[in-house]
Swiss-Prot record:
Keywords assigned by UniProt, alphabetized: Signal
Record protein name field: Uncharacterized protein in trpE-trpG intergenic region
NCBIfam families tied to this protein: autotrans_barl (TIGR01414)
Signal sequence region: 1-23
Residues annotated as catalytic: 37 (nucleophile), 294, 297
The Autotransporter domain, residue ranges: 334-592
GO cellular component: outer membrane
Region named Disordered: 572-592
Keyword Signal attached: yes
Recorded family membership: Belongs to the 'GDSL' lipolytic enzyme family.
One BP term from GO: lipid metabolic process
Family annotation (PROSITE patterns): AUTOTRANSPORTER, LIPASE_GDSL_SER
Length: 592
């Protein structure tokens, strides 16, 4: 019987209690845009409906910014029907939005004909500069792995097509029809703006039309949301009116000017009152301090806010689907600590023996495919065993595990406390040995803080939730050397099954950026081969080491169903984390 104190180094699970892996920064194959001037990338000879920068170039619109954040090729984000493209030999892009488009023209650009036509109120109004078949014309199909981005509705109001609640509801339904057409053509992920409050724009603020237009904007959005909820696709609504109202209520938090009329003034002075301080001819020209460039279009500040808002929603699953993985990491760390304890010498038959209290502390950093994070973990394991006879030893163990994970580019912070209990059995006869454990526990996600960029500052949304975990694991091995030998070498096979469930929760702020998440469940089924060895290095010291290779059979992509807490009836499911089939040492597994 071995009675020497033990030193054990397990290569297969080093730092397992704190490591994490990250999903790719974009699961989308591309980005295709439809809409009006709010998203127009330059159909009219490169003109965009936002401010000029310091070099005299047009600032990007929100889908161009979002596409860059998602890693989409800039060429693909360009205009689809610009008359300059064929003249200059430039390829058409995937942005089909055209300034002046009504909801009917947006639908036509998808299903029949895309026209770059001079909008009403402009010189040459009605002249078609270029036309081409619509995106899905001639039987073409949408890309189910691409992100589709849809804006529209404002021009139905500006061009006099909406004069009553019935007109507003019909316009909202027409915009939803564009999303429906994309879904029927094969699109799966469709992001749709809610119409901004037209009463809160320089064009109508302070006029008799302000209140009626605010009410009609709301009717439009109610109709739009109702119709979107009936489409069999992942429809991602953007609550743009709520976001902009937050910016107007607390401008300094968004980098906007304080003490200025952000609704009644604009940057360019084109048709509206130019801001005397930050307008283009003001004392300190700076479009980033203003929300509007002209009567109805946002500056780069507004475009950036909306792009960041959209990205915060799309990127949330890449972090939140790691919550079950944190629990699986705790389970594996607990199982490894049990195996560590099982290397201690067996006590006499009919007697008990406490486990050696263990409280390791570890750190690890990872960086994958543009996402990075740092994890750290602490745990405490206690318990004891009882030897039934020469061949069997039984025991109980409990463990408390605390993990903190910082994820993403803005250091989101997630904390998990795991409370695990195990019953285990060990067997040895001649040179054969085996062990098995059944584990169950409670998961306390006490502090979940998702942090993301929103304009010039970061914003955090907080929540908490609970969960449960259980697992069964076993090993069977054979010692190649006699028990009395100074060295041991034992090949083994292993099998593990674990299941984690994380309860759904809502982030608590009630703001436009707050999200709600449904329950998540993640199962792990692993088989492994390994080699365990030990050597007596000193009379009182034996060194243990282990190497193992496992295969994960549950390697499907992890998705999460979510919703904006401000729009709870419109949920959608987005892509998150994908486990490795063969976890790296020190990781629960993850591949970009």
């Amino acid at each position: 019987m071995r009675k020497a104190p033990l030193l054990r180094f397990t290569l297969a699970s080093l730092a397992l209690a704190c490591s994490q892996a990250f999903a790719a920064p974009s699961p989308y194959s591309g980005m295709i845009v439809f809409g009006d001037s709010l998203s127009d990338a330059g159909q009219f000879g490169g003109v965009r409906f936002t401010n000029l920068d310091a070099n005299g170039n047009y600032a990007p619109v929100s889908p161009m910014i979002l596409g860059g954040q998602l890693g989409v090729n800039p060429t693909e984000l360009g205009p689809s029907t610009s008359p300059l493209n064929p003249v200059l030999g430039l390829p058409d892009g995937n942005n089909w939005a055209v300034g002046g488009y009504t909801t009917q023209q947006i639908l036509d650009s998808i299903t029949s004909t895309s026209e770059t036509v001079i909008p009403p109120g402009r010189p040459g109004a009605g002249q078609v500069l270029r036309e081409k078949p619509g995106y899905l014309a001639n039987g073409l199909r949408a890309d189910p792995n691409a992100l589709y981005y849809l804006t529209g509705g404002g021009n139905d109001f500006l061009q006099g097509l909406v004069n009553s609640p019935a007109d507003a509801a019909a316009a909202g339904a027409r915009l939803a029809a564009s999303a429906q057409a994309l879904q029927q053509g094969g699109a799966r992920y469709i992001m749709v703006w809610l119409l901004p409050d037209l009463g809160q724009t320089p064009n109508f603020s302070g006029t008799p039309q302000q209140t009626p237009l605010s009410l009609l904007s709301g009717v439009f959005n109610q109709s739009l949301l109702s119709q979107l909820g009936q489409i069999d696709a992942e429809i991602i609504p953007l609550n743009v009116p709520m976001l902009l109202s937050e910016a107007l209520a607390s401008p300094s938090q968004f980098g906007l000017a304080t003490g200025q009329n952000l609704v009644g003034t604009c940057s360019s002075g084109e048709g509206c009152v130019e801001n005397p301080v930050y307008g283009i001819n003001g004392t300190t020209p700076d479009p980033t301090k203003l929300l509007f460039n002209d009567l109805v279009h946002p500056t780069i500040a507004g475009q950036q806010l909306i792009a960041d808002y959209a990205y915060s929603i799309l990127s949330a699953p890449w972090e939140l689907t790691l919550l079950p993985e944190m629990a699986h990491t705790s389970l594996r760390a607990h199982q490894d600590e049990l195996r560590n304890q099982w290397q201690t010498p067996w006590q006499a038959v009919g007697s008990g023996k406490p486990l050696s209290p263990a409280a390791p502390r570890t750190w690890i950093s990872t960086a994958r495919a543009g996402a990075s994070g740092d994890g750290r973990g602490y745990n405490l394991t206690v318990g004891g065993s009882y030897r039934l006879n020469d061949a069997w030893r039984l025991g109980l163990a409990g463990g408390v595990y605390r993990q903190k994970l910082e994820a993403g580019g803005h250091d989101s912070d997630y904390t998990l406390n795991s409370y695990l209990a195990s019953a285990f059995a060990q067997y040895r006869q001649d040179r054969w040995w085996a062990d098995a454990a059944l584990t169950a526990g409670h998961l306390d996600y006490s502090d979940l803080k998702r942090t993301f960029a929103l304009g010039v500052n970061d914003r955090s949304e907080k929540g908490d939730t609970d969960g449960e975990a259980w697992a069964i694991s076993g090993r069977l091995g054979y010692n190649l050397a006699a028990d009395s030998s100074n060295w041991q070498l034992a090949p083994f096979i292993s099998a593990d099954y674990a299941r984690v469930k994380v309860d759904g929760y809502d982030e608590k702020s009630g703001r436009s950026t707050a999200l709600g998440f449904d329950d998540q469940a993640r199962t792990s089924r692993r088989l492994g081969l390994g080699l365990q060895g030990s050597v007596q290095v000193l009379p009182s010291t034996r060194l243990f080491a282990e190497v193992a290779q496992e295969h994960e059979f549950e390697d499907d992509r992890q998705d999460v169903t979510m919703h904006l807490t401000s729009l709870p009836a419109n949920d959608f499911t987005l892509t998150g984390y994908t486990p490795h089939t063969a976890p790296d040492p020190g990781e629960p597994g993850g591949k970009p």
